[in-house]
Amino acid sequence: MIPGNRMLMVILLCQVLLGGTNHASLIPETGRKKVAELQGQAGSGRRSAQSHELLRGFETTLLQMFGLRRRPQPSKSAVIPSYMLDLYRLQSGEEEERSLQEISLQYPERSASRANTVRSFHHEEHLESVPGPSEAPRIRFVFNLSSVPDNEVISSEELRLYREQVEEPSAAWERGFHRINIYEVMKPLSERSQAITRLLDTRLVHHNVTRWETFDVSPAVIRWTKDKQPNHGLVIEVTHLHQAQTHQGKHVRISRSLPQGHGGDWAQLRPLLVTFGHDGRGHALTRRARRSPKHHGSRKNKKNCRRHALYVDFSDVGWNDWIVAPPGYQAFYCHGDCPFPLADHLNSTNHAIVQTLVNSVNSSIPKACCVPTELSAISMLYLDEYDKVVLKNYQEMVVEGCGCR
């Protein structure tokens, strides 16, 4: 994994080169004079061309860290699924500030335990009826997974379907059930043969409930991504027990045109395929408690090595159009002296103590340096270059502790 302090360098230098006027949140007080001097020296046309090339290089470095081929340019029609926002809040600990009614899902511990990347996909709008052995309607829909990188190993996948209750006067109806079956299309329908499908998951659910249902479709998606088998889509079949044919399939929301209420909510209620994968870099997603600020006791000499505040605001560098959350984060940085003799609170190594001792008698040997000794990860929710929503864990992004090394 590329060290987190490299990303901080990229962000800081991009801010300088962009020539923004508001550095309050991004540049610490002690660094503003140097930034102003750099900007003052940047008046020539030659500097403008050089800074443009540097900016492109820095942005390329950042995009490589994110695993992106190019800078995302989100379309106005891009939709952020509520599920992904809730998953981000649960994963980052923000649900502690929200009521249980606002976040109505449980964190998928099992799926996330082997993944550092979560991706969401909406199905393509074109739907197709697929004949089956029963009279229950079977609808085929396709998810385009071509944006999943080759180096990302998919470990589990879930299909989320929204179903609404259908009001009926019969008491027997309210006590009834219906079954939802999910199939993988192994061979599509053709003029010469019927479609061949295999059952992936099934669920018996109560009629009189409105909620999201989750189905395990891992075998199909792993075949498509890892084994490079053809993706012919999925089929949904809804069978209502002891129900008239006119009501078959009315519960599950898979099409914009279905005669259901809340038509304007289609963007949030349409089927959603969620993949959990790992790109081989960093640790898996883990549900974290909300990070509380560390309070360091007052030190006699504030010039010594310690942690300083550094808030990275993505809007300052123009990346807030594709980074959904967080809007920024407290990255911190390490700065200060490592004087002889090194005190215990400076978190030094034996080598740093020896180096500082030698420096006290031979100034040609440099002092120990104030550097991060503990770094933590952050989670980011963003739109990639294909307008797909991604939740990813990035290591070594926040300084938790400093020391002389």
Swiss-Prot record:
Residues 20-291 form a propeptide. GO terms for cellular component: extracellular space. GO terms for biological process: beak formation; beak morphogenesis; cartilage development; embryonic skeletal system morphogenesis; intermediate mesodermal cell differentiation; negative regulation of DNA-templated transcription; nephric duct formation; ossification. It holds the Pfam family TGF_beta. It comes from the Eukaryota. One of its GO terms (molecular function) is growth factor activity. Its main location: secreted. Keywords: Chondrogenesis, Cleavage on pair of basic residues, Cytokine, Developmental protein, Differentiation, Disulfide bond, Glycoprotein, Growth factor, Osteogenesis, Secreted, Signal. The keyword Transport does not apply. Disulfide bonds join C305-C370, C334-C402, C338-C404. It is found in: Secreted. Negatively regulates the structure and function of the limb apical ectodermal ridge. Belongs to the TGF-beta family. This is Bone morphogenetic protein 4. It comes from Gallus gallus (Chicken).
